[in-house]
């Protein structure tokens, strides 16, 4: 690559020999102000001088970076004063996250260019002679020639205010926002004739102190006492040591009856109720538990042995198969093999 450019540069140098350099004071082609670097491809109107160190065919070192010094300041040549980071602002755009748009107003307050309402006065010639807002309209007014009923409330000087009501009840300055207007004092009954304190009896259940026991809010009202009438036998009604009586059949009379129907039999007596020792209680624990898998898709096929309805079928160990042994054969005169006994 370097050898090719070296040969090309030497060819351009020979072609431009003896010609005056016309573009000494002008900007050469391939040179820009933004990127002041040398062009890698030479052209005809440019005189390129290749040093002897780069004319070698191999191991040539070409210049890849521009080392010309200029007056442009570098990145750290000047100081920029940045504002402090915003941490307490509601707007996320001020923090630099740019996830949500800022809620701050982008425009300042709009100041009206027109005068205010009280900044000027209207001349009397321009004002309307009749103001409809001050005129009386019969549409929204009461009839004028109807007698108005006076208020029945007393006048300020028709009653005497009680001083005790006007005084402050307590020294608390705070008052409730929704103060009740119900009087808390004693109100005498307007209907006399009620019973005196000794003319009636007070229910003692209302006066007694309730037991200090936790009581449910939904307390049952069912009575827990014994019923006065019981249909069952009492504790001493039966004897557990006595044996139960065996009912015997009643004998029919041997006298002949002249009826077409048989004589009615008496009703059997009711057997006595069993006592505490006439039956045995067995500790029944229920059917045996089988460990069954609790998978979401359990097979419905039974995994336990089921008694067969056909008892004639043999079981797994009811017979014993025997493997036949080896047999020997004899070759007879008819050229046939006969098993030997």
Swiss-Prot record:
Signal peptide: none annotated. It holds the Pfam family SHIPPO-rpt. Transmembrane segments: none annotated. It is found in: Cytoplasm; Nucleus. Keywords: Apoptosis, Cytoplasm, Nucleus, Phosphoprotein, Repeat. The keyword Repeat applies. Its main location: cytoplasm. One of its GO terms (cellular component) is nucleus. Residues 12-23 have a biased composition (Basic and acidic residues). One of its GO terms (biological process) is positive regulation of apoptotic process. Residues 1-10 have a biased composition (Polar residues). The modification Phosphotyrosine is found at residue 78. STPGR repeats lie at residues 73-80, 115-123, 154-160, 194-213, 232-254, 273-284, 313-323. Residues 1-23 are annotated as: Disordered. Belongs to the STPG1 family. May positively contribute to the induction of apoptosis triggered by O(6)-methylguanine. This is O(6)-methylguanine-induced apoptosis 2. It comes from Rattus norvegicus. The gene is Stpg1.
């Amino acid at each position: 690559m370097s050898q090719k450019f070296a040969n090309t540069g030497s060819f351009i140098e020979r072609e431009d020999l003896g010609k005056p350099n016309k573009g000494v004071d002008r900007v050469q082609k391939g040179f820009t102000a933004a990127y002041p670097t040398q062009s890698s491809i030479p052209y005809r109107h440019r005189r390129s001088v290749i040093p002897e160190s780069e004319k070698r065919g191999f191991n040539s070192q070409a210049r890849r970076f521009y080392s010309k010094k200029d007056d442009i300041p570098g990145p750290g040549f000047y100081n920029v004063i940045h504002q402090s980071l915003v941490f307490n602002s509601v707007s996320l755009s001020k923090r630099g996250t740019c996830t949500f748009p800022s809620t701050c107003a982008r425009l300042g307050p709009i100041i009206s260019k027109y005068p205010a309402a009280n900044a000027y006065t209207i001349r009397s010639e321009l004002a309307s002679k009749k103001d409809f807002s001050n005129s009386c309209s019969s549409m929204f007014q009461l009839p004028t020639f109807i007698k108005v009923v006076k208020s029945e409330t007393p006048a300020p000087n028709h009653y005497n205010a009680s001083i005790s009501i006007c005084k402050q009840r307590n020294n608390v300055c705070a008052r409730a926002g929704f103060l009740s207007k119900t009087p808390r004092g004693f109100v005498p009954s307007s209907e006399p004739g009620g019973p005196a304190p000794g003319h009636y009896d007070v229910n003692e259940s209302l006066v007694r102190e309730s037991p200090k026991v936790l009581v449910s809010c939904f307390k049952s009202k069912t009575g827990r006492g014994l019923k006065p009438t019981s249909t069952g036998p009492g504790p001493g009604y039966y004897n557990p040591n006595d044996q139960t009586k065996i009912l015997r059949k009643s004998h029919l009379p041997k006298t002949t009856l002249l009826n077409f129907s048989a004589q009615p039999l008496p009703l059997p007596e009711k057997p006595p109720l069993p006592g505490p020792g006439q039956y045995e209680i067995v500790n029944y624990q229920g059917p045996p538990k089988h460990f069954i898998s609790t998978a979401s898709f359990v097979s419905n096929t039974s995994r336990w042995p089921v008694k067969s309805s056909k008892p004639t079928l043999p079981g797994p160990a009811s017979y014993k198969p025997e493997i036949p042994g080896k047999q020997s054969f004899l070759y007879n005169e008819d050229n046939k093999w006969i098993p030997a006994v």
